[in-house]
Regions:
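Conserved RNA-binding domains used in RNP assembly and mRNA/RNA metabolism
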Residues: 2-76
Length: 76
């Protein structure tokens, strides 16, 4: 039997995602891993009361709105 390397897909609780996003607000650059498989890097704005935010990459002139429930992982 051969072994295959598979990507580790972490699924944090929504509470943990909120904590990660709250910490990421103070970072200049973060990487968000979305539940749909997208990975986007940039600076974030996050409203913890609404559970929504926006990631902005000025170098690529790109932004994306998101809900906390759409986030799988946050890397600082």
């Amino acid at each position: 039997m051969g072994s295959t390397a598979s990507r580790k897909k972490r699924k944090y609780s929504l509470e943990r995602i909120y904590d990660l996003l709250m910490n990421a607000r103070q970072s200049n650059w973060v990487t968000l891993h979305f539940t749909d498989g997208d990975v986007v890097s940039g600076a974030i704005i996050f409203n913890e009361y609404k559970g929504t935010g926006r990631i902005i990459n000025v170098d690529q002139e790109f932004s994306r709105d998101f809900k906390a429930a759409e986030i799988r992982d946050v890397k600082l």
